[in-house]
C-alpha cells in the first residue's frame, strides 16, 4: 500500500493565534491518523516506477526523454529512458512533466512567520506556539517541493527545532529532511541581542551569547548536546546601509571563528555565518566556514579564498525583495539595499565564486521560496548553474552529498515533477505538481 499525503494549505501568510495554530495542527493530526496504517506499510511497499516526458540530470545538464525512475523502498535503484518494471510494481505516469530531484533550501527559518516583526514574535509568542507554527511551516515547504532544508536558527526558541526535526524523521509530521542549528550564536549587544528594548526588562537575546573563543567552544558543545547538526554564527552586526554601501561591524575575529570551525568539525559538524561586508566576510573565509550567508560586499581577497576553499555564498534575495515590497517609510531604503545586492551578485558571478540557494523564508510565507531560484536567474545566473547550486552545493551543505540532490541509483528517492523544463523556464520550480520524499508520495497523483 502506498502512502499519499494530500495537500491542504494550512500555512497562511497572516499572523496566527495559538487557537488557530491548534486548529490547524488538529487538522494535520487527523490527516495522519487516517493514514497511520498506510504509513507502517509504506516502507514495505512494492517497487514504484515514475514515468514522465522528461528527466533532468543535474550534474551533466542532460535531459532524458522520456524519463523513468525505479524506486525500491526509500531509495532509487534505476534511472533512464526505460527502467525495469518488476512484477507487481506500482507505475505512476506523470504525463508531460519533468522529473528532477527535490529542491534544497539552505537558509530557512521555520520558527518565523509573516505578519509580525521578528523581534515581536520572539517576545510575544511562546516557544510551544512557535513550535506548532514551525511544524506547519515545514509541511508547507515540503509540499512546495523542498525535500531538504537547513534551518538557520530558531531566533530565540532554543533547541525546539530538535523536536521538529526528530518528529519529522519519526514520521509523526510531514516535512523536509532537516539540518538544524538551535539558536544562532552572537556577541553581547550583537545582531540578535535585545538592543532596542528597555534594558530594565532584561529581555533575552534571540541568540546564544559567546564573546570569545572559549565561550564559542562551550556554546557549540551545549548546542550539540541539545541536538544541533551544525552551527550558525552572526559574524556581522546589524546591517547599516550608508552612502550606497554596507557598514556592518564584524563580531568575531578570524581566530575566534577558526576555533568554532575546529570544534564543530571535531564532532562532525560545520559552521555557517551570517556575514555582509568586510572584514567580517574575510574573517569567515579565512576560518574555513561552510557557507557565507547574505554575502554582500565581498572583497577580491575574500572571493579568492572562497574559490580556493569552495565556500558557497548564499545570496537570500527573496527576503530582501520581500522587505523592499513592504509598505512604509523603509521600503525605499530596502529597495536600495536590494539593488546593491544585485550589483554585488553580478561581481561575484564574474569572479566565479560558488553559490548555494537559500531564501531566508520565514518573514515571507513558507512554501513560496522557490522564487529564490527565479531571482538568481533574473539577476544573471544560468538556469542550470542555479539548479546545480541548489542541489549539488545544497546537498554538500546538508552533509548529504551522494544521498540527495541527484537522481541516481542509491540516492534517496526525493523527487519532484514540474510542468516544464526549468532549463527553459526556471519559474517551473514554483509550480511543483508532484513530490516524493524517501519513496513516499506526499503530493500528486496516486498510482495508476
Walk through the language-model features, giving the residues of each.
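His/Asp/Glu-enriched, well-ordered alpha-helical/loop segment
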Residues: 122, 266, 335-421
Amino acid at each position: 500500500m502506498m502512502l499519499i499525503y494530500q495537500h491542504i494549505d494550512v500555512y497562511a501568510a497572516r499572523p496566527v493565534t495559538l487557537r488557530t495554530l491548534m486548529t490547524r495542527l488538529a487538522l494535520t493530526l487527523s490527516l495522519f491518523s487516517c493514514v497511520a496504517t498506510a504509513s507502517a506499510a509504506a516502507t514495505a511497499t512494492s517497487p514504484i516506477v515514475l514515468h514522465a516526458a522528461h528527466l533532468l540530470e543535474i550534474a551533466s545538464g542532460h535531459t532524458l526523454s522520456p524519463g523513468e525512475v525505479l524506486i525500491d523502498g526509500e531509495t532509487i535503484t534505476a534511472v533512464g529512458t526505460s527502467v525495469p518494471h518488476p512484477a507487481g510494481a506500482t507505475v505512476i505516469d506523470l504525463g508531460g512533466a519533468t522529473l528532477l530531484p527535490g529542491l534544497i533550501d539552505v537558509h530557512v527559518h521555520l520558527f518565523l512567520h509573516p505578519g509580525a516583526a521578528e523581534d515581536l514574535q520572539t517576545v510575544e509568542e511562546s516557544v510551544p506556539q512557535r513550535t506548532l507554527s514551525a511544524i506547519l511551516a515545514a509541511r508547507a515547504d515540503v509540499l512546495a517541493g523542498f525535500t531538504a532544508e537547513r534551518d538557520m536558527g530558531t531566533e530565540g526558541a532554543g533547541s525546539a527545532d530538535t523536536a521538529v526535526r526528530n518528529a519529522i524523521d519519526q514520521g509523526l509530521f510531514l516535512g523536509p529532511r532537516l539540518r538544524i542549528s538551535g539558536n544562532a550564536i552572537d556577541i553581547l549587544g550583537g545582531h540578535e541581542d535585545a538592543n532596542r528594548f528597555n534594558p530594565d526588562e532584561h529581555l533575552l537575546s534571540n541568540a546564544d551569547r559567546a564573546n570569545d573563543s572559549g565561550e564559542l567552544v562551550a556554546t557549540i558543545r551545549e548546542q550539540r548536546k541539545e541536538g544541533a547538526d551544525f552551527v550558525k554564527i552572526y559574524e556581522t552586526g546589524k546591517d547599516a546601509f550608508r552612502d550606497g554601501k554596507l557598514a556592518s561591524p564584524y563580531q568575531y575575529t578570524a581566530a575566534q571563528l577558526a576555533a568554532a570551525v575546529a570544534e564543530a568539525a571535531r564532532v562532525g559538524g560545520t559552521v555557517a555565518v551570517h556575514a555582509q561586508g568586510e572584514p567580517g566576510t574575510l574573517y569567515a573565509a579565512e576560518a574555513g566556514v561552510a557557507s557565507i550567508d547574505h554575502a554582500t560586499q565581498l572583497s577580491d581577497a575574500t572571493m579568492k579564498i572562497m574559490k580556493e576553499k569552495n565556500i558557497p555564498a548564499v545570496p537570500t534575495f527573496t527576503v530582501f525583495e520581500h522587505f523592499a515590497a513592504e509598505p512604509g517609510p523603509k521600503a525605499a531604503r530596502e529597495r536600495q539595499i536590494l539593488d546593491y545586492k544585485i550589483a554585488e551578485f553580478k561581481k561575484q558571478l564574474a569572479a566565479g565564486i560558488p553559490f548555494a540557494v537559500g531564501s531566508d523564508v520565514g518573514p515571507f510565507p513558507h512554501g513560496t521560496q522557490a522564487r529564490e531560484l527565479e531571482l538568481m536567474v533574473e539577476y544573471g545566473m544560468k538556469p542550470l548553474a542555479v539548479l546545480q547550486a541548489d542541489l549539488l552545493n545544497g546537498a554538500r551543505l546538508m552533509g548529504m552529498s551522494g544521498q540527495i540532490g541527484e537522481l541516481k541509483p542509491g540516492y534517496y528517492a526525493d523527487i519532484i515533477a514540474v510542468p516544464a523544463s526549468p532549463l527553459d523556464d526556471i519559474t517551473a520550480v514554483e509550480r511543483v505538481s508532484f513530490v516524493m520524499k524517501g519513496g513516499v508520495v506526499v503530493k500528486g497523483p496516486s498510482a495508476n
